[in-house]
């Protein structure tokens, strides 16, 4: 038995000590982090790679253009310094002849410039002449074909073609006129410059021959410097273009970065839900009971008290019957009365143990009117109402007495004294009863008004 237990224990794998477990957990966490980083690197927006390549290319172009521009400027400066030094040495060597021959060389430069302008004006004039000749030939051919073909009609298309040809002829004539004027002006300037140059050449022939090496070297350096200046301008334009591409790539990367950050922020925040407390309020509204509210003890007691008073009034007086009938025509049960007020959740301590709700009180006593109309037993409206009811009762009693008298008069003379005594007794009983009813009515209304005040206080507190 012991040997079997030892064998089973030896077969079980030995548990690792706590430090070894912690090392393994750390290694697993590092592997997970590396996997997460690899996944993030895989999810990089492909546009970033393209924009980064453009950015690197623009950086290389900017560096290369800046180097080339610096070399060109350095070369321009070196050539300028070299020309200045050599021309100064040559001017000192030649001496005064350089200054004396300057007017001739200046006139020669102006004549050369006028010659170039005249040549350009001559080319423009020849081109305008050729265009005018071609337009005139087009019009002549169109007219000739129209005249040769007897069947051809002079339609709108033919008219439009002739109009275009005529317009080209007019434009060519205007261009020819302008180029002819320019050619005449440039030719006149060229002739004047050549005349002045020949005149100065005859006058300053010796100084011109002596200073000729100086001005030839100066012209050579001038052409070289012009070429270098053009190269510098081209490199500056290319550098500005490379900087523009670099700026555009930076803006694209910034836009992509903003989009990525916005997407991450929206993913972290999640979809927008309801506001704080919105779910609770919605749930409370949905869970509100749809059943009718329970009546309370005060409304039931007031209803019973009013029913008792009204039943007494109905049995004694017809006028009271009308008022009670108007009262009974309204809804008397909670199921018949509409809900004037929505159901509102309230604390359990304020619930009244009664089968009638406070919201139905206004429908149960329509005869009393609003609260402002009868606010107490001493109100003038209530006094007037009680007086009217008492007067109506007295009128009824007088009518009944008159009827009894008429009936007594129709009877024999023997029963007249008996009818009069019975009528007087009946009238006294009626008057006593009316006084009791008026007192009961006033007391009942005072109690009802007090109950109404209490109910309004409770209703206001609940709201």
UniProtKB/Swiss-Prot annotation:
Family note: Belongs to the SH3BP5 family.
Entry GO CC: cytoplasm; cytoplasmic vesicle membrane; mitochondrion; nuclear body
GO BP terms: intracellular signal transduction; negative regulation of protein kinase activity
Comment field on protein domains: The N-terminal half of the protein mediates interaction with RAB11A and functions as a guanine nucleotide exchange factor. Four long alpha-helices (interrupted by a central kink) assemble into coiled coils, giving rise to a 'V' shape.
GO MF annotations, alphabetized: guanyl-nucleotide exchange factor activity; protein kinase inhibitor activity; SH3 domain binding
Membrane topology listed for this record: Peripheral membrane protein
Stated name of the protein: SH3 domain-binding protein 5
Compartment annotation: Cytoplasmic vesicle membrane; Mitochondrion
Assembly and oligomerization: Interacts with BTK. Interacts with all isoforms of MAPK8, MAPK9, MAPK10 and MAPK12. Interacts with GDP-bound and nucleotide-free forms of RAB11A.
Residue ranges the record marks as coiled coil: 47-93, 100-148, 157-203, 214-258
Region (Sufficient for interaction with RAB11A and for guanine nucleotide exchange activity): 33-268
Span list, region Disordered: 1-69, 309-348, 372-429
Function: Functions as a guanine nucleotide exchange factor (GEF) with specificity for RAB11A and RAB25. Inhibits the auto- and transphosphorylation activity of BTK. Plays a negative regulatory role in BTK-related cytoplasmic signaling in B-cells. May be involved in BCR-induced apoptotic cell death.
Compositionally skewed regions (Acidic residues) per UniProt: 25-44, 309-320
Cross-referenced InterPro entries: SH3BP5 (IPR007940)
